[in-house]
């Protein structure tokens, strides 16, 4: 991981520096919804940019990261620092994507995300950028896939209390996961990504609610996790209600705007229900403690 993380950081610094040196201009982009299907920005954008502002997959890797720390005191520097660093890297790449191609139509025709990264890297950093792009776009996702399969295997084995010491036991759990992975390769990427995005953000929502309960049980300020948990509950609920891969088909021929409004209302109701449930259980816990 250190070498891939370093390549991403070096590439981001190089791209950012290149934008400054070349005095790159970001075109004036109107703050309007450009979705050709007429769908709203919310909640779809919050699912499309999965692993951006919040990520359930990142949450599952926290225990693995924690095992690499020498002391618990390093946790704040590592996790908070990683969060800020990832945000800066995201802003650099957003600026690069907007300025390099000259406008929205050109960016839309540039190709897939991997192609865009390669074009920008080679265009700004030359051959060095191409090598870094190879590490960041090809090698890094491969290691992420490896981590995903390993995490899934360990999660399933732990849930079933199935020991993973013997190599045969590992294969028994891993092979079915590999079969599922191969099957997913035959499904269009944009469909897989939408399901991944929703499941990823749903997992993040669950992690936030777990954090809320954890903080409350220890008498800490749980609002710092409660407000994001409430917001994300609205996001994931309203998305799965209104999205094409969700329950939108049950609304028949209703106008999509009407469906989206209904979905957001349902999301708010679910969020308020979860919040009420938390306060009720938290009050009971306090009474038992007293």
Task: Identify what each model region corresponds to.
Residues 1-59:
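Helix-loop-helix junctions that connect adjacent transmembrane segments
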Residues 63-87, 106, 114-120, 145-172:
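Helix-loop-helix connectors at the membrane interface of multi-pass transporters/channels
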Residues 18-31, 80-119:
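Extracellular/periplasmic helix-exit of transmembrane alpha-helices
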Residues 208, 214-227, 243-290:
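Terminal cytosolic tails of multi-pass membrane transporters
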Residues 1-22, 196-207, 223-231:
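Membrane-interface loop-to-helix entry segments
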Residues 8-33, 212-222, 235-247:
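Hydrophobic alpha-helical segments and their helix-loop junctions in multi-pass secondary transporters
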Residues 49-69, 93-95, 127-160, 201:
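Membrane-helix boundary/coupling elements in multi-pass transport proteins
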Residues 81-90, 98-108, 128-134, 139-142, ...:
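Loop-to-transmembrane helix boundary motifs in multi-pass membrane proteins
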């Amino acid at each position: 991981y250190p070498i891939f993380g370093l390549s991403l950081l070096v590439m981001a610094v190089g791209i950012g520096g290149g934008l400054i040196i070349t005095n790159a201009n970001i075109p004036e982009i109107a703050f309007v919804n450009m979705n050709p299907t007429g769908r709203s920005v919310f909640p779809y954008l919050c699912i499309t940019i999965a692993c951006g502002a919040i990520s359930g997959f990142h949450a599952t890797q926290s225990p693995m990261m924690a095992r690499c720390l020498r002391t618990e005191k390093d946790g704040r520097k590592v996790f908070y620092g990683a969060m800020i660093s990832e945000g800066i890297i995201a802003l650099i790449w957003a600026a690069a994507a907007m300025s390099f191609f000259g406008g929205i139509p050109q960016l839309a025709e540039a190709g897939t995300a991997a192609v865009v990264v390669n074009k920008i890297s080679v265009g700004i950093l030359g051959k060095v950028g191409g090598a870094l792009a190879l590490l960041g776009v090809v090698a890094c996702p491969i290691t992420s896939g490896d981590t995903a399969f390993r995490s899934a295997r360990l999660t399933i084995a732990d849930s079933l209390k199935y020991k993973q010491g013997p190599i045969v036991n590992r294969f028994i759990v891993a092979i079915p996961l590999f079969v599922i992975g191969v099957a997913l390769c035959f499904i269009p990427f944009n469909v897989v990504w939408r399901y991944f995005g929703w499941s990823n953000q749903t997992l993040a929502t669950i992690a936030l609610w777990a954090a809320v309960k954890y903080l409350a049980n220890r008498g800490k300020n749980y609002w710092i996790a409660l407000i994001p948990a409430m917001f994300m509950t609205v996001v994931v609920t309203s998305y799965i209600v209104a999205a094409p891969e969700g329950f939108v088909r049950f609304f028949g021929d209703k106008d999509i705007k009407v469906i989206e409004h209904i979905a957001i209302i349902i999301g708010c109701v679910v969020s308020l229900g979860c919040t009420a449930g938390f306060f009720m259980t938290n009050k009971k816990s306090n009474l038992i403690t007293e």
